[in-house]
Amino acid sequence: MHQLLRALLGGLALLLACGPLTVFGAETSRVPGGDADAALGAVFKDIEQSRLGSALEKVDALLVGYPNFRLAHLIRGDLLLARTRPLVSFGNSQDAPADKLADLREEAIARLKAYRNRPPSNYVPRYLLQMEPEQKYAIVVDTQRSRLYIYQNDNGRPRFVADYYITHGKLGAEKAREGDKRTPVGVYHVTANLPRQKLSDFYGSGAFPISYPNEWDRQQGRDGHGIWLHGTPSDTYSRPPRASDGCVVLTNRDLDALSSYLQIGLTPVIISNTIEWLSVDDWASERRSLNNQIEDWRKDWESRDVDRYLAHYSKNFRNSEGGYEQWARQKRLVTASKNWVKVDLGKLSVFRSPGKQDLIVVTFEQD
C-alpha cells in the first residue's frame, strides 16, 4: 500500500513512512469538527492501511463541506482510478498541467506535516516574550510550513488556541522591494478591517492589512505596501502554499474564524521563515532576562546618571531626529535641567523579531 501512497502523494509517502498517523476522534464518514486538515489526516491513514473504500467515503464527506477543495477532488479521482488499474503518479488526469499537480502535492505535504506535527503544549514561539494586557491574542506565521498560529494572552503567558493552513509569497519570504512577490518577515500589527463588500471577489470574505513596512523595515531600506491577511475567491477553497504576491492568504472559513481574534491596532502579527520554539522554562528565563534589561534602563534614566543611561544605547542608534551624538547631546541638556526624573512604563510589550538580526521590539506608554 505504500506504493499507492507514492502514486497518490509522491514525496508525501516518505512522511507517512516515518510512523503511523494519529487521527483524533472516532473514525466516521463525517468531517471531524469541520476541520479539513483533520479530515485529510483520516483519509491518509485509511490509504496507509489499505482501506480505500473508507478513504473514498471520507473524501466524499469532505467535499460535501468543502466543494471547491481542489486537492480533495484530485485525491478522489486517484482513489476511483485505483479501483481499475495501478497508479503511477500523483494526479492521473491527462489534462492536468504538471505545475498545477506540483502545487497540489505541495499543499498536501504542508497540510499533513502540520496536522501530524502540532507544537507541544509546553513549547511556545520564542517571539512572544510579553504581550501588553490589552492584547488578547497574537498571530505567528511560519512561511516554510505554510501555517498560521493563534496564541492567547493568558496573564502574560502565550497559550495555543488554533492553527490554519496559509498561502504566502510566490518567491518566498523576506520581502525587500515593491513587487518582489515575497512575504515580509518581522513584527507587525493589524491596522484595519476591510469587509467583503468593499473588496473584489479575489480577496474572499475580507482582508486585514498589516503594518508593513514597519520602522525597522524603513531603516533597512525596504519598501512596498499592501500586505494583508485575506481570503480566497468564491470559486476557490484554498490556494497553493506559494501563490500570493506577498500577502498571507487563508481559506474564507479560516479567515472568518481568525477575524474573531483580531483587534485593530493591537493584535501583533509576527511573520517568520520558520518558527523558533522554546520550552516554557526557557521562554520564562529569556523573558526575565529582557525585562531585567528594560528595568535597568528605566532605573538608569531615573538616576540622572547620563553616562549610565547612554551605556544602554548603541553608537549606531538612530531616530527620526538623527544619530547617537545628537541623542546624547539632547539627553545631557534635558537631564541637567531637571532636579529629579520619574519614569513609569505602562502597556509594555516585548516581541523578538524573526530573521537574521538579533532584534527585540519593545513598546510601552511612558507616564
Place the predicted regions along the sequence by residue:
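Alpha-helical linker/edge segments of TPR/alpha-solenoid repeat scaffolds
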Residues: 80-126, 339-343
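Surface-exposed, charged secondary-structure patches
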Residues: 330-367
